[in-house]
Amino acid sequence: MRIPSPHYSPGPYALLLLLALTACATPPAREASPTALDLASPRYSNWQIRGRVSLVKGDQGWHASLNWREDAGRYRLDLSGPLGQGAIRLEGDAAGVRLQTADGHDYVAEDADALVLAVTGWQLPVAGIRYWVRGVPVPGRPAVVKTDAAGHLVSLAQSGWDIRYDRFQDVDGRAWPTRMRLTTDDLSVRLVVDDWILGSAPASAASNAVSAPSP
């Protein structure tokens, strides 16, 4: 006589436990960083960031608040508080760049990085940060990009700079960097983004002007 084998049917509590274990085993998904193709689209051609930047070299350093706007290839960078100058403004496009100080001096050049270095004495890779802050290398230049096992951006190296990404923010279905560290030789630059804005900037931001020093 054959004894039928018992048939096991999991109860509702066992099913709930299985679902909970499955959820714990699956890490939360993070949106992909933008690609060079994404940034070339009209959807991402206008953007703005507000945040803070600091530079440290040896026992010297400075920090400033930052407001950076880009409109279809034209950019404007306002730095408030660097080097005791009150504020500086940098405006540029493919044709060149103009730097204005709080005391009314204007400087014009073809290269933004060289102009900032000549006026302030500090090396700030403006041309690179325009792309690195969006999580992509500068087009047309050799770069080494590192991602984690899930394909998320971890770091990139380009033009003598090493860029480490520590934090991202989901905006419009993409992961945009909000904390990054740039190093070259003995210089360290830290950039913290408090606000990412995609599309046309609000009028209040557009009217932010370089302020003159107090008498």
Feature locations, PLM:
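Bacterial Sec signal peptide processing site at the extreme N-terminus
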Residues: 20-40
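An acidic-aromatic
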Residues: 74-124
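Sec-dependent bacterial lipoprotein signal peptides
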Residues: 1-24
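Envelope-exposed proteins and targeting segments
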Residues: 45, 64, 73, 86, ...
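Extended lipid/amphipathic-ligand handling interfaces
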Residues: 66-69, 90-92, 166-170
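Gly/Pro-enriched, hydrophobic low-complexity segments
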Residues: 135-215
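Post-signal-peptide N-terminal segment of Sec-exported extracytoplasmic proteins
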Residues: 42-76, 80, 87
